[in-house]
């Protein structure tokens, strides 16, 4: 009998998007992919799955040491909420449904914030069409944007511009934050 830790789902030092810090040799994945873990998709037979006692996650310290180890921000950002999805997988049985899990996960934001955990929020959705830039979030986070490196300001609605590359959006809620993203054609993120 064994405990499993497939890297493409549970190595929390892996990048969460192509433009964020972290390793990428096992996979690039966020909380949604962690939650989507399935034994059959990973090549386990039913007989092999029957011998699994549980799942576990890992964060390899060489990456942490390269990011100011005096503060937990980077470790928190890389680990949470992926660790929440891992816990759900390890302790809950039955059919998993992302929308329901994400609804419950958002309830944990206040708890993680109260504990001082610097968790990662899902990135804002940004689009640019016909000279109009829009951004949205799926939670109660505050959406902000700096224009070309200026002080961030609250996003209150669509922005008319011919220069979408000057706008990057980030959401924050308590001690959580999202990566900073732009319109897909100009997409990039900053380091956490």
Segments (PLM) and residue ranges:
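Flexible, acidic glycine-rich loops studded with aromatic residues
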Residues: 1-132, 138
